[in-house]
Amino acid sequence: MKIAQIVASLESRHGGPSRSVRGLACGLAGIGHTVGLLSTVPGGDGVSKIDGTLDTRIFARERPQAFCPSKPLRHHLLTTGYEIVHHHGLWLRTLHYARRAAVKASAPLVISPRGMMSEWAWNHHRFKKSFAARWIHPKALATAAGWHVTSDGEAEDIRRLGFTQPVCVAPNGVLPPSVDEETAAIIHWRNAYPVLAARRVALFYSRFHAKKRVLELIDLWLSVPRGDWVLLLAGIPEEYTVAQLEGYVLRQGGIGRILVHDGTDAPPPYAVASLFLLPSHSENFGLVVAESLVRGVPVLTTDATPWHKLETVGAGRCVPWNLYAKPLASLLAETPETLAARGRLGSAWVRDDFSWGKTARTLSAFYEKLREAAR
C-alpha cells in the first residue's frame, strides 16, 4: 500500500509523537509498504529524503503556527494519491488537508488522537477545541474511516465521545538505545550537573504542562526529606518555562533537592536515573514510560496511564494520584540492587511486547480491512 503518515511536527519539543510517528513510519516501510512521512516546520523545503520505501518530506509551516497551516503540504497530499491517509493529532489544519486528500483519492482516513480525546484533555481549553473542530478541520472526526489508538483506555475515550467507527489498538514500539548513546547521555548530564554522579536520581522527563502534574510533583517531593535522592525535572517547556519552574522550586525551598533543565536538545537522561516518575492526569500511551523501562529504569506512574501491568510485572507501580505519596516513599527506600532488579524485569517485558514491527503488522491489517469495506 501507498500510505501517508502525517504529523504536524517532528520537532523534539512536541514530545512523544515526534518520535513515535517516525518509528511507525519506519516499521510500515520495513514490512514492504511505500510510506510518506509528512510533516511541517518553519522554513521547510518539502525535499524528499528517501530511505528504502520511506519517503520523508518536511514542508513549510505558515502562520498562525499554532494551527500548522501549510499550502505545500496540502498540495502534495492532493496530488500524490495515497491509498491510506493516516493523520496523528487533532485541532490542526493538517488534519483538514488529510481529510480532503482522502476524499479526493477515495482512500480511508485514519486518525490517531494521540491522547487528545481523554476526558481531561478533551475538556482542557474546551472553547479552543470546539473552534478547531468546527473551523480548522470541519467534519474530519465524523467522517474518518477508522481510528488508531495506543491503548484500550484510549479506545474507550473515543466510544465515550460517541464515535462509532472501527478502532485499532496498536501500542507504540520502543527501540533500545546503543551503548554509545547511553554513554554520551551520562557524560552530558553529569557534565551539566556533577551532583548527579554522587546522588541517586528520580527523573521526570516529559513536557512541562499541567497535564503532567509537574507542579504537584514538586510539592510532593518537597513535602518530606528524600535522603540522598535528587529530583531531575528535564522537560520540554510548554505551559511552564524553565525559569517559572525554577522560581517555583525556589519559593518552595527546594534548591539543592530539585534540578530543572530544558531537555529539548539534550540526550534523553534515563541513563543517570534510578527511578522514573510520571504523575500525569492522562496519557494515551506514555512513550517515556516505555523508553525508561527498555533502559532498565523502573517507573512510578498514575492509573490514568495505560501502564497497569507495571504492578504484575514488578517493574514499578501504577496507582491513583491521591495514593502516589506512599509508593513513592517506598520505592525511594529500596536499595539500588532492588530497583535495578525491577528495571531488568521492565526491560525484558517491553522488549518482548512493544516492537514497531508488531505494531506495523497490526495496523497494516487494519488498513486493509478499511480498504475492503470501502470497495
For the regions a language model picked out, list residue spans one by one.
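Carbohydrate-associated surface elements
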Residues: 153, 173
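Aromatic "clamp/platform" in nucleotide-sugar-dependent glycosyltransferases that forms part
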Residues: 281
